[in-house]
Curated annotation (Swiss-Prot):
Protein name: Disks large homolog 2
Gene3D superfamilies per UniProt: 2.30.42.10, Guanylate Kinase phosphate binding domain, P-loop containing nucleotide triphosphate hydrolases, SH3 Domains
GO biological process terms on file: cell-cell adhesion; chemical synaptic transmission; establishment or maintenance of epithelial cell apical/basal polarity; nervous system development; protein localization to synapse; receptor clustering; receptor localization to synapse; regulation of postsynaptic membrane neurotransmitter receptor levels
Subcellular location: Cell membrane; Postsynaptic density; Synapse; Membrane
Broad class of where this protein is predominantly found: membrane
Domain SH3: 539-609
Protein's organism: Danio rerio (Zebrafish)
InterPro entries to which the protein is assigned, alphabetical: DLG1-4_PDZ_assoc (IPR019583), DLG1-like (IPR016313), DLG1_PEST_dom (IPR019590), DLG2_SH3 (IPR035759), GK/Ca_channel_bsu (IPR008145), Guanylate_kin-like_dom (IPR008144), Guanylate_kinase_CS (IPR020590), P-loop_NTPase (IPR027417)
Job of this protein: May play a role in synapse assembly and function.
Keywords: Cell membrane, Cell projection, Lipoprotein, Membrane, Repeat, SH3 domain, Synapse
The PDZ domain, residue ranges: 155-242, 250-337, 424-505
Amino acid sequence: MKAVVRVLKLEERAVHRQQNRPPAVQGSQHQSHSPACMNPALMSSPWVRQKHGGRAIPNRLCLSTTDSPHSYRYQDDDSPPPEHSFPRLTNEVRAPELVHVSEKNLSEIENVHGYVSHSHISPLKASPAPIIVNTDTLESVPYVNGTEIEYEFEEITLERGNSGLGFSIAGGTDNPHIGDDPGIFITKIIPGGAAAEDGRLRVNDCILRVNESDVSEVSHSKAVEALKAAGSIVRLYVRRRRPMLETVTEIKLIKGPKGLGFSIAGGVGNQHIPGDNSIYVTKIIDGGAAQKDGRLQVGDRLLMVNNYTLEEVTHEEAVAILKNTSDVVYLKVGKPTSVYLSDPYGPPDITHSFSPAMENHISSPGNNGTLEYKSSLPPISPGRYSPLPKHLLGEEDINRNPSLDEMEGHRFDSQHFQLREPRKIVLHKGSTGLGFNIVGGEDGEGIFVSFILAGGPADLSGELRRGDQILSVNGIDLRGATHEQAAAALKGAGQTVTIIAQYRPEEYGRFEAKIHDLREQMMNHSMSSGSGSLRTNQKRSLYVRALFDYERAKDSGLPSQGLSFRYGDILHVINASDDEWWQARRVTPEGDSEEMGVIPSKRRVERKERARLKTVKFNAKPGSLDSKGSFSEKRRKNFIFSRKFPFYKNKDADEQDGSDSERSQEELILSYEPVIRQEINYARPVIILGPMKDRINDDLISEFPDKFGSCVPPANSSDQEDTTRPKRDYEVDGRDYHFMASREQMEKDIQEHKFIEAGQYNDNLYGTSVQSVKYVAERGKHCILDVSGNAIKRLQVAQLYPIAIFIKPRSIESLMEMNKRLTEEQAKKTYDRAMKLEQEFGEYFTALVQGDTLEDIYNQCKMVIEEQSGPYIWIPSKEKL
């Protein structure tokens, strides 16, 4: 019956989705243009192809994760019987045709994926060379701030692969993608697909015709139908903006008191020029490094910063790259040439491009040390490409500290702020301390401010800046102090701190130049006021798996550019010689990534987490139990049969599971796990833990029976394979269970670690043996295991390294949203159980998965399994950190 219900669900899901595509929301020009449901790499996988009528149907229909009234929602385990939950189909329904349609609430994006071994020009009609056509010949001439846009046209012939054409589209008359343009635009080229193999189609190309079908002014759905009906050989006639003529030059800037001194706009999802994701210079700040150098101009396109490309990055990523530079910055810049000859908003004289600096009235600092700005805003002449107000374009000044004079309109008037003279600053400590870092204190060179934490007391006051020398703290003279003495003075200064500071950029510059070499060698020391020791050990390199999420923007103590990562990421630690900071690169399937940065060491992570846990325990309510300890104790006391069989208790098993009792005594801090790369020749078992795991397991086996299997046939209600229970008349040995000859034999096998999990029910033993898992794995199927987290380690010991996925709920509310029948109390219990699972087995998980819908979670699980399938995988090593 269970298998029949599953088939019904799949058929019902296909029909329901085909008939109930959510309509696009009209009228919004601020859209999200990324495919909504699945990673492109996964969509091109054979796993995502359903079988229908004996033939492969390319792509699986997938809906948005939004709460559209037409969105399909999986049934949860406690939902009503299937006959009461099918949607009412009032219209006549044709046989379901599964296609991939990815929709979001504000825009529709069609993924047309595919992979072909070659792409060629149709012999019927050769692709002509690109034709340059001036838009004067069009009925409606597009303009960008008075400049006519020139287009070129190209015909591209693609051969459809097994899964489609290999690109994503957005737009249409019902939901324009760029401004009011009704065109159908290319939003993504899928790596390995037909379009990528051909190499001519580009992001932002506008499709005018598909074979003989005109799609220049049609709805999104009509364009999708035209692409679907185009056959195996597809001719696309596309329009693209003529590339801007520009010369590329390199500019070296040296930061001064006002940082780099320019503003930027643009980026992916925040285009400064419609259809262009580039980063543009929009303002040159008076007195900044860019103005003094004289070569950078408004309208220049930033191509690279040092070794980091700014092509196809978001605005935030570009800002982060520019902010995290040292004092010497190399820019690769594209400068416009003849395209601006008729542009009335061509490059202005930078000395006249903006009105004089707005007047800043700085009031006396209040109790919180903040400054009050009252600005008079004179009219600003339009920039070269500014069809939208600047506050909608994400324009941002790039300077040394975004909270001080670098932010537009917050420049300091020298009449009010005599930086070169010693000055008194009063700060009040907040949750982040004083909000700045210090360096120096060696050989009497002085103590300098090296970093201002955004949003901290120092930042909010606006009075302290990088390059300030700290002369005294609450009357304690620090002019000749060591780093340790200065840190102690700041720590012990109380809530209200009076600082005498003097801006000395030249002295600080010399000091920073000296420590630059140390940074290059990774001899970093913590620049927070809490520590300043500099320890150098022998250089050490290793690979680790991250067991926590790390966001560099949230770490105020970073000594240099940090490297963000997520749980499960593999990191190549290039240098682990320092006790506080390691230098690392993220490892991708293609090898080490180019991005390199600093990450906190294992010692630093664990020290900070212990300090946090002490605070949490101190603030806990009286009578509350340590969740980890209580959970472990509960598992030890309640030894009953369940879907998660607690491991059979015996002397050896107790020794093996000793970590459970140890964890109840001492909190386990997760930081990094040393790993090595290994080649495997089997399909890795899959263990999914957390809410909705049963639905995910069932769907994987139902959708991909050739890829996934279980230790027993799916029609059997039990997920365990071996038992000491006598065989019943209707049961078959080896099909329903492996019936053991005697209890003594099974107990012996358990003691010899031949079972990954075992339990007792009605005086009979049940369990899943290592051999049964290996049998499935060696036949090329991922063995789906419904076991507890303890089985992960036991499989590793047996050298069957599982893919262990933890479904981590976002919140109690999200659980109730995914399962409408859950009460708040039930959702809370489910959430608490999930958190305890993470606490107890977090170090063994391959990946954490989160999503707003079951469909989203399911797709992420498939993606993780595909990425982790091998043949090369990372496994725990015995190296000590």
